[in-house]
Amino acid sequence: MDQQQQGLDRNTLVGIVLISVIMGVWMIFFAPEPPTPEQRQAIADSLAALQPDSLDQGEPFLVDPAVEGTLAAPTDSAFAAATQGTAETVVVETETYIATLSTKGGTMLNFVLKEYNKAGEEATPVDLVSNTDDGALAVVFTPPSGRIVDSRSLFFQTTASTQDTIRVTDGPQQIAFDAPIGGGALRLAYTFEPEGHGVGFAVEEVNSNLLTRAGGYELLWDGGLPFDELDANDESINAGAYVRAGGEVEQIKLSKEPELNELITGTIEWTAVKNKYFVAAILPGEGLATEGAELDGLRIGEPGEAAFDDYYTTRLLIPRAATGEPNPYTLYLGPVDLSFLDDYDESLYEVVDYGFGAFMTRPLAKYVIAPVFRLFGTFIPSYGVVIILFAILIKILLYPLTKSAYRSTAKMRDLQPEMTALKEKYPDDPQKQQEQMMKLYRDRGVNPLGGCLPLLLQYPIIIALWRFFQNSILIRQESFLWANDLSAPDPVLHLPF
Protein backbone atom coordinates (compact mmCIF):
# COMPACT_ATOMS: atom_id res chain seq x y z
CA MET A 1 0.00 0.00 0.00
CA ASP A 2 2.90 2.36 0.82
CA GLN A 3 4.49 1.61 -2.55
CA GLN A 4 1.21 2.36 -4.33
CA GLN A 5 0.87 5.61 -2.42
CA GLN A 6 4.46 6.55 -3.30
CA GLY A 7 3.66 5.94 -6.98
CA LEU A 8 0.60 8.14 -6.78
CA ASP A 9 2.58 10.89 -5.03
CA ARG A 10 5.27 10.69 -7.69
CA ASN A 11 2.71 10.97 -10.51
CA THR A 12 1.06 13.91 -8.80
CA LEU A 13 4.42 15.63 -8.38
CA VAL A 14 5.31 15.07 -12.04
CA GLY A 15 1.96 16.54 -13.11
CA ILE A 16 2.41 19.63 -10.94
CA VAL A 17 5.96 20.18 -12.20
CA LEU A 18 4.88 19.87 -15.85
CA ILE A 19 2.00 22.31 -15.43
CA SER A 20 4.30 24.78 -13.63
CA VAL A 21 6.92 24.51 -16.38
CA ILE A 22 4.33 25.11 -19.12
CA MET A 23 2.90 28.15 -17.32
CA GLY A 24 6.38 29.52 -16.62
CA VAL A 25 7.49 29.15 -20.25
CA TRP A 26 4.27 30.81 -21.41
CA MET A 27 4.75 33.82 -19.11
CA ILE A 28 8.40 34.21 -20.15
CA PHE A 29 7.90 34.05 -23.92
CA PHE A 30 4.43 35.57 -24.30
CA ALA A 31 4.37 38.27 -21.62
CA PRO A 32 3.87 41.79 -23.04
CA GLU A 33 7.07 43.67 -23.66
CA PRO A 34 7.70 46.64 -21.34
CA PRO A 35 7.78 50.04 -23.04
CA THR A 36 11.16 51.23 -24.24
CA PRO A 37 12.68 54.41 -22.77
CA GLU A 38 11.74 56.20 -26.00
CA GLN A 39 8.10 55.09 -25.66
CA ARG A 40 7.98 56.15 -21.99
CA GLN A 41 9.39 59.56 -22.90
CA ALA A 42 6.84 59.97 -25.72
CA ILE A 43 4.02 59.21 -23.29
CA ALA A 44 5.38 61.65 -20.74
CA ASP A 45 5.75 64.40 -23.36
CA SER A 46 2.20 63.83 -24.60
CA LEU A 47 0.72 63.91 -21.12
CA ALA A 48 2.62 67.08 -20.28
CA ALA A 49 1.12 68.74 -23.35
CA LEU A 50 -2.41 67.47 -22.89
CA GLN A 51 -3.04 67.33 -19.14
CA PRO A 52 -3.60 70.20 -16.72
CA ASP A 53 -1.93 70.01 -13.34
CA SER A 54 -5.27 70.12 -11.61
CA LEU A 55 -8.97 70.23 -12.38
CA ASP A 56 -11.52 72.27 -10.50
CA GLN A 57 -14.46 69.98 -9.76
CA GLY A 58 -17.63 71.03 -11.54
CA GLU A 59 -15.84 73.11 -14.18
CA PRO A 60 -15.28 72.07 -17.79
CA PHE A 61 -11.82 71.04 -18.94
CA LEU A 62 -10.57 74.29 -20.49
CA VAL A 63 -6.89 74.94 -20.05
CA ASP A 64 -4.72 77.94 -20.79
CA PRO A 65 -1.36 76.42 -21.81
CA ALA A 66 0.39 79.53 -20.50
CA VAL A 67 -0.99 79.00 -17.00
CA GLU A 68 -1.58 75.30 -16.43
CA GLY A 69 -4.21 74.36 -13.90
CA THR A 70 -6.46 77.39 -14.52
CA LEU A 71 -9.91 77.13 -16.08
CA ALA A 72 -11.53 79.96 -18.00
CA ALA A 73 -14.07 80.61 -20.73
CA PRO A 74 -12.70 81.18 -24.24
CA THR A 75 -11.69 84.81 -24.76
CA ASP A 76 -11.08 84.48 -28.49
CA SER A 77 -13.62 86.58 -30.40
CA ALA A 78 -14.42 83.55 -32.52
CA PHE A 79 -16.18 82.03 -29.49
CA ALA A 80 -17.94 85.15 -28.22
CA ALA A 81 -21.41 84.00 -29.29
CA ALA A 82 -20.91 80.56 -27.72
CA THR A 83 -19.81 81.71 -24.27
CA GLN A 84 -23.24 82.90 -23.17
CA GLY A 85 -26.52 81.08 -23.03
CA THR A 86 -28.89 79.01 -20.95
CA ALA A 87 -28.36 75.32 -20.27
CA GLU A 88 -31.39 73.31 -21.36
CA THR A 89 -31.87 69.58 -21.66
CA VAL A 90 -33.17 67.34 -24.41
CA VAL A 91 -34.52 63.97 -23.26
CA VAL A 92 -34.62 61.08 -25.75
CA GLU A 93 -36.30 57.76 -25.00
CA THR A 94 -36.01 54.53 -26.98
CA GLU A 95 -37.01 50.96 -26.21
CA THR A 96 -33.80 50.31 -24.28
CA TYR A 97 -32.60 53.61 -22.76
CA ILE A 98 -33.34 57.22 -21.81
CA ALA A 99 -30.65 59.74 -22.81
CA THR A 100 -30.41 63.28 -21.48
CA LEU A 101 -28.46 65.78 -23.60
CA SER A 102 -27.56 69.37 -22.73
CA THR A 103 -27.30 72.54 -24.77
CA LYS A 104 -24.37 73.40 -22.47
CA GLY A 105 -21.62 71.48 -24.22
CA GLY A 106 -23.89 69.53 -26.56
CA THR A 107 -22.94 66.60 -24.36
CA MET A 108 -24.59 63.64 -22.69
CA LEU A 109 -25.58 64.14 -19.05
CA ASN A 110 -27.34 60.81 -18.45
CA PHE A 111 -27.74 57.51 -20.24
CA VAL A 112 -30.16 55.33 -18.29
CA LEU A 113 -30.58 51.67 -19.24
CA LYS A 114 -34.23 50.77 -18.76
CA GLU A 115 -33.68 46.99 -18.44
CA TYR A 116 -30.96 47.02 -15.75
CA ASN A 117 -30.99 48.18 -12.13
CA LYS A 118 -28.20 48.99 -9.72
CA ALA A 119 -27.35 46.24 -7.26
CA GLY A 120 -29.27 46.61 -4.02
CA GLU A 121 -31.44 49.35 -5.49
CA GLU A 122 -34.09 47.60 -7.53
CA ALA A 123 -35.96 50.81 -8.29
CA THR A 124 -32.83 52.66 -9.48
CA PRO A 125 -31.86 51.96 -13.08
CA VAL A 126 -28.24 51.91 -14.20
CA ASP A 127 -26.96 55.28 -15.45
CA LEU A 128 -23.75 55.06 -17.48
CA VAL A 129 -23.09 58.81 -17.29
CA SER A 130 -23.22 59.79 -13.63
CA ASN A 131 -19.51 60.12 -12.80
CA THR A 132 -19.24 63.71 -14.03
CA ASP A 133 -21.37 66.83 -13.64
CA ASP A 134 -20.31 68.28 -16.98
CA GLY A 135 -21.19 65.33 -19.21
CA ALA A 136 -19.18 62.42 -20.51
CA LEU A 137 -18.63 63.29 -24.17
CA ALA A 138 -16.50 66.22 -25.30
CA VAL A 139 -14.53 67.59 -28.24
CA VAL A 140 -11.24 69.23 -27.21
CA PHE A 141 -9.11 71.30 -29.58
CA THR A 142 -6.60 74.15 -29.66
CA PRO A 143 -7.58 77.05 -31.95
CA PRO A 144 -4.99 79.50 -33.34
CA SER A 145 -5.26 81.57 -30.14
CA GLY A 146 -3.42 78.76 -28.35
CA ARG A 147 -6.03 78.19 -25.64
CA ILE A 148 -7.27 74.61 -25.28
CA VAL A 149 -11.05 74.57 -25.66
CA ASP A 150 -13.41 71.90 -24.33
CA SER A 151 -16.78 71.83 -26.09
CA ARG A 152 -18.45 71.45 -22.69
CA SER A 153 -17.58 75.10 -21.99
CA LEU A 154 -19.63 76.27 -25.00
CA PHE A 155 -23.35 76.87 -25.37
CA PHE A 156 -25.05 75.10 -28.27
CA GLN A 157 -28.31 75.69 -30.07
CA THR A 158 -30.76 72.99 -31.13
CA THR A 159 -34.10 72.77 -32.88
CA ALA A 160 -35.05 69.71 -30.83
CA SER A 161 -37.69 70.06 -28.14
CA THR A 162 -36.39 70.91 -24.68
CA GLN A 163 -39.86 70.67 -23.14
CA ASP A 164 -41.14 67.18 -23.98
CA THR A 165 -39.46 63.78 -24.10
CA ILE A 166 -38.58 62.77 -27.66
CA ARG A 167 -39.65 59.17 -28.18
CA VAL A 168 -37.90 57.27 -30.97
CA THR A 169 -40.22 54.50 -32.15
CA ASP A 170 -40.51 54.28 -35.94
CA GLY A 171 -37.04 54.97 -37.28
CA PRO A 172 -33.74 56.75 -36.64
CA GLN A 173 -33.93 60.32 -35.42
CA GLN A 174 -31.10 62.86 -35.47
CA ILE A 175 -30.66 65.65 -32.94
CA ALA A 176 -28.02 68.27 -33.75
CA PHE A 177 -26.38 70.87 -31.51
CA ASP A 178 -24.66 73.89 -33.09
CA ALA A 179 -22.20 76.17 -31.28
CA PRO A 180 -21.58 79.43 -33.17
CA ILE A 181 -17.82 79.76 -33.71
CA GLY A 182 -15.67 81.58 -36.23
CA GLY A 183 -18.54 82.80 -38.36
CA GLY A 184 -19.86 79.26 -38.68
CA ALA A 185 -20.68 76.50 -36.23
CA LEU A 186 -19.32 73.45 -34.47
CA ARG A 187 -22.00 70.80 -34.88
CA LEU A 188 -22.37 67.74 -32.66
CA ALA A 189 -25.08 65.44 -34.01
CA TYR A 190 -26.60 62.37 -32.35
CA THR A 191 -28.59 59.71 -34.20
CA PHE A 192 -30.88 57.51 -32.12
CA GLU A 193 -32.37 54.18 -33.20
CA PRO A 194 -35.61 52.72 -31.79
CA GLU A 195 -33.80 49.56 -30.63
CA GLY A 196 -30.33 48.55 -29.54
CA HIS A 197 -27.64 50.20 -27.45
CA GLY A 198 -25.89 52.11 -30.22
CA VAL A 199 -25.95 55.86 -30.80
CA GLY A 200 -24.65 57.54 -33.93
CA PHE A 201 -22.45 60.57 -33.29
CA ALA A 202 -20.82 63.05 -35.66
CA VAL A 203 -18.50 66.04 -35.35
CA GLU A 204 -18.78 68.64 -38.11
CA GLU A 205 -17.60 72.15 -38.87
CA VAL A 206 -20.21 74.22 -40.69
CA ASN A 207 -18.76 77.22 -42.57
CA SER A 208 -15.78 77.22 -40.23
CA ASN A 209 -12.27 75.81 -40.24
CA LEU A 210 -11.16 76.21 -36.62
CA LEU A 211 -10.76 72.46 -36.07
CA THR A 212 -8.80 72.13 -39.30
CA ARG A 213 -6.55 75.06 -38.38
CA ALA A 214 -6.14 73.56 -34.91
CA GLY A 215 -4.62 70.48 -36.50
CA GLY A 216 -7.44 68.24 -35.37
CA TYR A 217 -9.17 67.48 -32.10
CA GLU A 218 -9.63 64.93 -29.34
CA LEU A 219 -12.89 63.10 -28.74
CA LEU A 220 -13.19 62.34 -25.01
CA TRP A 221 -15.19 59.99 -22.89
CA ASP A 222 -14.68 61.45 -19.44
CA GLY A 223 -15.25 59.90 -16.01
CA GLY A 224 -15.38 56.22 -16.92
CA LEU A 225 -18.45 54.35 -15.72
CA PRO A 226 -19.86 54.53 -12.18
CA PHE A 227 -19.76 51.48 -9.93
CA ASP A 228 -23.16 49.77 -9.85
CA GLU A 229 -22.45 46.63 -7.78
CA LEU A 230 -22.37 46.14 -4.01
CA ASP A 231 -18.71 45.10 -3.97
CA ALA A 232 -16.88 48.19 -5.23
CA ASN A 233 -13.48 46.52 -4.84
CA ASP A 234 -14.50 43.61 -7.08
CA GLU A 235 -15.91 46.05 -9.62
CA SER A 236 -12.67 48.04 -9.57
CA ILE A 237 -10.73 44.86 -10.35
CA ASN A 238 -12.94 44.29 -13.40
CA ALA A 239 -13.04 47.94 -14.54
CA GLY A 240 -10.63 49.64 -16.92
CA ALA A 241 -10.01 51.76 -20.01
CA TYR A 242 -9.24 50.08 -23.33
CA VAL A 243 -8.11 50.83 -26.86
CA ARG A 244 -7.81 48.52 -29.86
CA ALA A 245 -5.13 49.36 -32.41
CA GLY A 246 -3.46 47.14 -34.98
CA GLY A 247 -5.58 44.18 -33.93
CA GLU A 248 -4.30 44.32 -30.33
CA VAL A 249 -6.06 45.59 -27.21
CA GLU A 250 -4.21 47.79 -24.72
CA GLN A 251 -5.68 48.54 -21.30
CA ILE A 252 -5.07 50.32 -18.02
CA LYS A 253 -6.53 49.13 -14.69
CA LEU A 254 -6.44 51.16 -11.51
CA SER A 255 -6.63 47.98 -9.44
CA LYS A 256 -2.86 47.82 -9.99
CA GLU A 257 -1.87 51.51 -9.68
CA PRO A 258 -3.76 54.56 -8.29
CA GLU A 259 -2.91 56.72 -11.32
CA LEU A 260 -2.13 55.56 -14.85
CA ASN A 261 -1.55 57.04 -18.30
CA GLU A 262 -0.89 55.37 -21.61
CA LEU A 263 -0.51 56.75 -25.12
CA ILE A 264 -1.09 54.51 -28.15
CA THR A 265 -0.21 55.70 -31.64
CA GLY A 266 -1.53 54.50 -34.98
CA THR A 267 -4.94 53.71 -36.41
CA ILE A 268 -7.52 53.17 -33.68
CA GLU A 269 -10.37 50.69 -34.06
CA TRP A 270 -12.17 51.67 -30.85
CA THR A 271 -11.74 53.03 -27.35
CA ALA A 272 -13.80 51.95 -24.34
CA VAL A 273 -14.32 52.31 -20.61
CA LYS A 274 -15.85 49.51 -18.58
CA ASN A 275 -17.04 48.55 -15.13
CA LYS A 276 -17.82 44.92 -14.32
CA TYR A 277 -20.94 44.46 -16.44
CA PHE A 278 -21.28 47.55 -18.66
CA VAL A 279 -19.18 49.28 -21.29
CA ALA A 280 -19.10 52.60 -23.15
CA ALA A 281 -17.20 52.37 -26.43
CA ILE A 282 -16.42 54.86 -29.21
CA LEU A 283 -15.96 53.35 -32.67
CA PRO A 284 -14.65 55.67 -35.42
CA GLY A 285 -16.58 55.49 -38.68
CA GLU A 286 -15.17 53.69 -41.69
CA GLY A 287 -12.51 55.75 -43.42
CA LEU A 288 -12.13 58.24 -40.56
CA ALA A 289 -8.45 58.96 -39.97
CA THR A 290 -7.12 58.53 -36.44
CA GLU A 291 -3.58 58.98 -35.19
CA GLY A 292 -3.75 57.49 -31.72
CA ALA A 293 -5.50 57.38 -28.38
CA GLU A 294 -4.72 58.17 -24.78
CA LEU A 295 -5.96 56.37 -21.69
CA ASP A 296 -5.98 58.10 -18.31
CA GLY A 297 -7.00 56.71 -14.93
CA LEU A 298 -7.26 58.18 -11.44
CA ARG A 299 -8.40 56.44 -8.26
CA ILE A 300 -10.37 58.42 -5.69
CA GLY A 301 -10.36 57.06 -2.13
CA GLU A 302 -9.58 53.52 -1.05
CA PRO A 303 -11.62 50.29 -1.09
CA GLY A 304 -14.13 50.34 1.73
CA GLU A 305 -14.48 54.12 1.77
CA ALA A 306 -17.76 55.74 0.76
CA ALA A 307 -16.01 58.00 -1.78
CA PHE A 308 -14.10 55.14 -3.43
CA ASP A 309 -14.30 55.25 -7.24
CA ASP A 310 -12.16 54.85 -10.34
CA TYR A 311 -12.21 57.58 -13.00
CA TYR A 312 -11.13 56.74 -16.52
CA THR A 313 -10.81 58.98 -19.57
CA THR A 314 -10.28 57.89 -23.16
CA ARG A 315 -9.05 60.39 -25.74
CA LEU A 316 -9.36 59.56 -29.41
CA LEU A 317 -6.89 61.68 -31.40
CA ILE A 318 -8.26 62.90 -34.75
CA PRO A 319 -5.64 64.61 -36.96
CA ARG A 320 -7.95 66.84 -38.98
CA ALA A 321 -11.56 67.76 -39.67
CA ALA A 322 -12.68 68.68 -43.17
CA THR A 323 -15.19 71.52 -43.34
CA GLY A 324 -18.61 70.31 -44.43
CA GLU A 325 -17.77 66.64 -43.97
CA PRO A 326 -19.05 65.08 -40.72
CA ASN A 327 -16.66 62.85 -38.82
CA PRO A 328 -18.86 59.82 -38.01
CA TYR A 329 -18.69 57.63 -34.90
CA THR A 330 -20.75 54.93 -33.27
CA LEU A 331 -21.21 54.91 -29.52
CA TYR A 332 -22.00 51.60 -27.83
CA LEU A 333 -23.49 52.17 -24.39
CA GLY A 334 -24.76 48.98 -22.84
CA PRO A 335 -24.07 45.64 -21.19
CA VAL A 336 -21.03 43.45 -21.81
CA ASP A 337 -23.24 40.94 -23.60
CA LEU A 338 -22.00 39.06 -26.67
CA SER A 339 -25.41 39.13 -28.33
CA PHE A 340 -25.27 42.96 -28.33
CA LEU A 341 -21.54 43.60 -28.73
CA ASP A 342 -21.22 41.54 -31.90
CA ASP A 343 -23.76 43.80 -33.62
CA TYR A 344 -21.25 46.66 -33.41
CA ASP A 345 -17.81 45.05 -33.42
CA GLU A 346 -16.92 41.42 -32.69
CA SER A 347 -13.68 42.45 -31.01
CA LEU A 348 -15.46 44.51 -28.32
CA TYR A 349 -15.75 41.36 -26.18
CA GLU A 350 -12.00 41.63 -25.67
CA VAL A 351 -12.69 44.11 -22.85
CA VAL A 352 -13.42 41.01 -20.74
CA ASP A 353 -10.22 39.79 -19.10
CA TYR A 354 -9.59 36.07 -19.63
CA GLY A 355 -6.07 36.06 -18.24
CA PHE A 356 -2.75 35.20 -19.87
CA GLY A 357 -4.31 32.20 -21.65
CA ALA A 358 -6.98 34.31 -23.33
CA PHE A 359 -6.02 33.05 -26.79
CA MET A 360 -7.53 29.71 -25.70
CA THR A 361 -10.11 30.61 -23.07
CA ARG A 362 -11.80 33.59 -24.76
CA PRO A 363 -12.71 31.70 -27.99
CA LEU A 364 -14.02 28.82 -25.87
CA ALA A 365 -16.22 31.19 -23.89
CA LYS A 366 -17.33 33.23 -26.89
CA TYR A 367 -18.08 30.51 -29.43
CA VAL A 368 -18.95 27.50 -27.27
CA ILE A 369 -19.88 28.29 -23.67
CA ALA A 370 -21.87 31.52 -24.21
CA PRO A 371 -24.06 30.23 -27.10
CA VAL A 372 -24.88 26.97 -25.30
CA PHE A 373 -25.60 28.76 -22.02
CA ARG A 374 -27.86 31.27 -23.77
CA LEU A 375 -29.61 28.44 -25.65
CA PHE A 376 -30.42 26.72 -22.36
CA GLY A 377 -31.72 30.02 -21.01
CA THR A 378 -34.24 30.40 -23.86
CA PHE A 379 -36.35 27.43 -22.75
CA ILE A 380 -35.45 27.12 -19.04
CA PRO A 381 -36.89 30.00 -16.96
CA SER A 382 -34.42 29.74 -14.07
CA TYR A 383 -30.73 30.45 -14.62
CA GLY A 384 -30.00 28.51 -11.43
CA VAL A 385 -31.35 25.38 -13.12
CA VAL A 386 -29.43 26.31 -16.28
CA ILE A 387 -26.17 26.44 -14.32
CA ILE A 388 -26.85 23.01 -12.78
CA LEU A 389 -27.64 21.46 -16.16
CA PHE A 390 -24.65 23.21 -17.69
CA ALA A 391 -22.37 21.78 -14.99
CA ILE A 392 -23.73 18.29 -15.68
CA LEU A 393 -23.18 18.76 -19.42
CA ILE A 394 -19.58 19.88 -18.90
CA LYS A 395 -18.97 16.92 -16.60
CA ILE A 396 -20.28 14.56 -19.29
CA LEU A 397 -18.18 16.18 -22.00
CA LEU A 398 -15.03 16.02 -19.87
CA TYR A 399 -15.70 12.47 -18.71
CA PRO A 400 -13.56 10.82 -21.44
CA LEU A 401 -10.56 12.89 -20.38
CA THR A 402 -11.20 12.20 -16.70
CA LYS A 403 -11.65 8.49 -17.37
CA SER A 404 -8.42 8.39 -19.38
CA ALA A 405 -6.54 10.04 -16.51
CA TYR A 406 -7.97 7.60 -13.95
CA ARG A 407 -7.21 4.62 -16.19
CA SER A 408 -3.62 5.73 -16.72
CA THR A 409 -3.20 6.27 -12.98
CA ALA A 410 -4.55 2.78 -12.30
CA LYS A 411 -2.09 1.24 -14.77
CA MET A 412 0.79 3.08 -13.16
CA ARG A 413 -0.37 1.84 -9.77
CA ASP A 414 -0.37 -1.75 -11.04
CA LEU A 415 3.21 -1.32 -12.23
CA GLN A 416 4.49 -0.10 -8.88
CA PRO A 417 5.68 -3.52 -7.61
CA GLU A 418 7.68 -4.18 -10.80
CA MET A 419 9.13 -0.66 -10.80
CA THR A 420 10.19 -1.13 -7.18
CA ALA A 421 11.83 -4.44 -8.12
CA LEU A 422 13.80 -2.72 -10.92
CA LYS A 423 15.09 -0.12 -8.47
CA GLU A 424 16.19 -2.87 -6.09
CA LYS A 425 17.80 -4.80 -8.96
CA TYR A 426 19.83 -1.82 -10.21
CA PRO A 427 20.30 0.31 -7.06
CA ASP A 428 23.53 1.96 -8.26
CA ASP A 429 22.72 2.37 -11.96
CA PRO A 430 20.02 5.05 -12.53
CA GLN A 431 20.49 4.89 -16.30
CA LYS A 432 19.83 1.16 -16.33
CA GLN A 433 16.79 1.71 -14.11
CA GLN A 434 15.41 4.26 -16.57
CA GLU A 435 16.01 2.00 -19.57
CA GLN A 436 14.24 -0.93 -17.94
CA MET A 437 11.33 1.25 -16.78
CA MET A 438 10.81 2.63 -20.30
CA LYS A 439 10.89 -0.93 -21.64
CA LEU A 440 8.32 -1.89 -19.01
CA TYR A 441 6.09 1.04 -20.07
CA ARG A 442 6.26 -0.03 -23.71
CA ASP A 443 5.57 -3.67 -22.97
CA ARG A 444 2.52 -2.83 -20.86
CA GLY A 445 1.28 0.02 -23.10
CA VAL A 446 1.49 2.62 -20.35
CA ASN A 447 2.16 6.34 -20.87
CA PRO A 448 3.81 7.76 -17.73
CA LEU A 449 2.28 11.16 -18.53
CA GLY A 450 -1.15 9.74 -19.23
CA GLY A 451 -2.41 10.66 -15.79
CA CYS A 452 -1.67 14.40 -15.98
CA LEU A 453 -2.07 15.25 -19.68
CA PRO A 454 -5.86 14.67 -19.76
CA LEU A 455 -6.19 16.88 -16.69
CA LEU A 456 -4.00 19.51 -18.34
CA LEU A 457 -6.26 19.51 -21.41
CA GLN A 458 -9.21 20.37 -19.16
CA TYR A 459 -7.45 23.46 -17.80
CA PRO A 460 -8.51 25.93 -20.57
CA ILE A 461 -12.13 24.75 -20.33
CA ILE A 462 -12.27 25.18 -16.56
CA ILE A 463 -10.66 28.64 -16.72
CA ALA A 464 -13.01 29.71 -19.55
CA LEU A 465 -16.00 28.60 -17.49
CA TRP A 466 -14.75 30.46 -14.43
CA ARG A 467 -14.11 33.69 -16.32
CA PHE A 468 -17.41 33.46 -18.21
CA PHE A 469 -19.58 33.05 -15.11
CA GLN A 470 -17.56 35.65 -13.24
CA ASN A 471 -18.35 38.30 -15.90
CA SER A 472 -21.67 37.13 -17.39
CA ILE A 473 -24.44 39.70 -17.15
CA LEU A 474 -26.93 36.92 -17.93
CA ILE A 475 -26.92 35.80 -14.29
CA ARG A 476 -26.66 39.30 -12.79
CA GLN A 477 -29.50 39.83 -10.27
CA GLU A 478 -30.98 36.42 -11.14
CA SER A 479 -32.26 34.59 -8.05
CA PHE A 480 -32.32 30.87 -7.27
CA LEU A 481 -33.60 29.26 -4.08
CA TRP A 482 -32.13 31.34 -1.19
CA ALA A 483 -29.64 33.23 -3.41
CA ASN A 484 -30.89 36.67 -4.42
CA ASP A 485 -28.14 37.26 -6.97
CA LEU A 486 -26.32 34.41 -8.70
CA SER A 487 -23.54 36.76 -9.81
CA ALA A 488 -22.71 37.86 -6.25
CA PRO A 489 -21.12 35.95 -3.36
CA ASP A 490 -23.62 34.31 -1.03
CA PRO A 491 -22.89 35.70 2.46
CA VAL A 492 -23.19 33.18 5.28
CA LEU A 493 -22.29 35.47 8.18
CA HIS A 494 -21.88 39.25 8.35
CA LEU A 495 -18.98 40.04 10.67
CA PRO A 496 -19.04 43.33 12.63
CA PHE A 497 -15.72 44.52 11.14
Question: Which residues fall in each region the model found?
Answer:
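Acidic/proline-rich low-complexity IDRs
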Residues: 46-49, 54, 61, 70, ...
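Short, Gly/Pro- and small/polar-rich lid/capping loops
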Residues: 54-89
